Amino acid sequence: MKKIYFAGSIRGGRDDKDLYAEIIEKLKKYGEVLTEHLGDKTLSVMGEYVKKSDFIYNRDIEWLKTADIVISEVTNPSLGVGYELAYAEKLNIPVVCLYRPSADKKLSAMIEGNKNFNVFEYQKVQDLDEFFIKIFN
């Protein structure tokens, strides 16, 4: 069973929390989602209230180190997600970036221009079904 690290914005904005929950449910068909809490609709932009930042950092780095693949939703820019992607790249962990193009949300050149990242553009969560079958099988 694959260990999947899902990355998405928390403190950078929770506008996509419902989408994250749907993506995480789809990913669970292919393995253990280490960061399943990102789909928690009660998680606010303040993050995990009871946990200190250093605890969250250390825990997430440990999860990253054990991951077989990183799947990230990068439409909503996030410093934390960018850091996680760079860390995963340094560890030679495959990175997939899911992105919904729109007139007001442009993908960072640091993501789009990185040949080590697999960027997949989509519009609806249903568009991910075939893509996930392809990358996990």
Segments (PLM) and residue ranges:
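Conserved catalytic or regulatory cores that recognize and/or transform ribose-phosphate-containing ligands
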Residues: M1-N137
